[in-house]
Design a protein with these regions (language model features):
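Conserved Helicase C-terminal RecA-like lobe
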Residues: 1, 18, 31, 35-41, ...
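Conserved helix-turn-beta segment of the N-terminal RecA-like "Helicase ATP-binding" lobe
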Residues: 61-86, 174-177
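Conserved pre-motif I regulatory segment
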Residues: 1-25
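Conserved P-loop NTPase motor "coupling/switch" region that bridges the ATPase
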Residues: 52, 78, 122, 130, ...
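Conserved Walker A/P-loop ATP-binding site and its immediately adjacent core
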Residues: 35, 50-72, 161-166, 325-328
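Conserved helicase motor
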Residues: 60, 81-91, 107-111, 132-135, ...
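Conserved helix/coil segment N-terminal to the catalytic DExD/H
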Residues: 88-122
Length: 337
């Protein structure tokens, strides 16, 4: 497919190319991934400024979204990627591949830092808010890796879903403490005051008057922030298909019920009496659970729950309305969320 960038995408691409440190805050639907990949391609094959790029993302985004975007767009097909997920042997094999871009899920960043001898001259953090906890192992691993990296891009839709305090860790990774300070205590003392406390024990902080404007001013020179409502003429509703894939075993069960109208499961037998019943049973299986003939619920997979969890996380505190088909869908969603 031919990529026809919007003007805001052209601006963001050039911004990444001209800024060694970039915080790119784009709403859902504004094309963060293809924008970043286009900048990577230009830096790699036009100006020859980078040779090896590391992308850190949530598991399903790392495994599916980034590789799919590279395959989707004609101008990106020159980029070779290796997806570093799965078991330790699978990850080791992925790192041994000759690639332009290595894509790792954030849960394996610590492992990558401790076990990989590869040098990366550019890092992309897809969902920068994953690094808002300055006490997490992944934050410490990225903090240690950061001085060896020439270029870094942080992607997110909503950078401070839980307030301004989150920004410190995110920008500590990006600019190594240049703008908001090297230490969280320094940042707190400068921009916040104690809120809820019990004697000398402080449970929460609130921004000082004018702190928000001062913080945004400090990070403005490396930040691009765009909202979909400002840059896209959008209809009242935009439908985006979020596909999930079943494992071989899950697909075999689905096909067996579809073909024979009966399926033996550990939790009981499932029978479809007619075409209408079969459609309902297959819909249940696609959603992840199914009612047996005895009205018990048997879980088949969590694929849609995993995808929903990613969507809720990317909303970063914004309201999300979730519709469900079956009662067991509601129960499983509530249990997961």
């Amino acid at each position: 497919m031919k990529f026809m960038p919007h003007e805001y995408q052209k601006y963001a691409i050039e911004y990444i190319k001209s800024h060694p440190v970039t915080a790119l805050f784009l709403d859902m639907g504004l094309g963060k991934t293809v924008t970043t990949l286009t900048a990577i391609r230009d830096l790699m094959y036009d100006t020859f400024e980078v040779q090896r790029v590391l992308v850190v993302a949530p598991l399903r985004v790392a495994r599916d979204t980034w590789p799919d975007e590279i395959k989707k767009w004609d101008h990106l097909k020159c980029l070779a990627c290796s997806v570093v997920v799965g078991s330790v042997p699978e990850r080791r094999r992925a790192l041994q591949q000759d690639a332009d871009i290595y894509i790792v899920n954030r849960e394996n960043l610590v492992w990558l830092y401790e076990n990989s001898r590869l040098d990366f001259d550019m890092v992309v953090l897809d969902e920068l808010s994953s690094f808002k906890n300055h006490q997490s192992k992944r934050f410490r691993a990225m903090k240690a890796l950061r001085p060896r990296v020439k270029r870094i891009v942080g992607l997110t839709g909503t950078p401070s879903g839980n307030g301004l305090m989150d920004l410190w860790a995110e920008f500590r990774i990006l600019d190594m403490g240049k703008r908001l300070g090297r230490y969280i205590s320094q940042y707190r003392n400068l921009y916040f005051q104690p809120d809820k406390r019990n004697g000398m024990v402080v449970y929460s902080y609130k921004p000082l008057p004018g702190a928000e404007e001062a913080i945004y001013h400090q990070i403005a020179d490396i930040t691009v922030s765009m909202k979909a409502t400002d840059y896209l003429k959008m209809p009242e509703l935009v439908s985006v298909a979020k596909e999930v894939s079943l494992s071989e075993k899950e697909k075999e069960r689905y096909d067996e019920l579809k073909k024979y109208l009966v399926l033996e499961l550990p939790g009981g037998e499932v029978t479809a009496a007619n075409a209408a019943s079969l459609t309902l049973k297959l819909s249940q299986m696609a959603n992840g659970a199914i009612y047996t003939d005895d009205k018990d619920v048997v879980t088949i997979h969590d694929r849609k729950l995993d995808a929903l969890e990613d969507l809720v996380e990317s909303a970063n505190g914004k309201p999300v309305l979730v519709a469900y088909w079956f009662k067991h869908d509601k129960d499983r969603i509530r249990k997961r969320m």
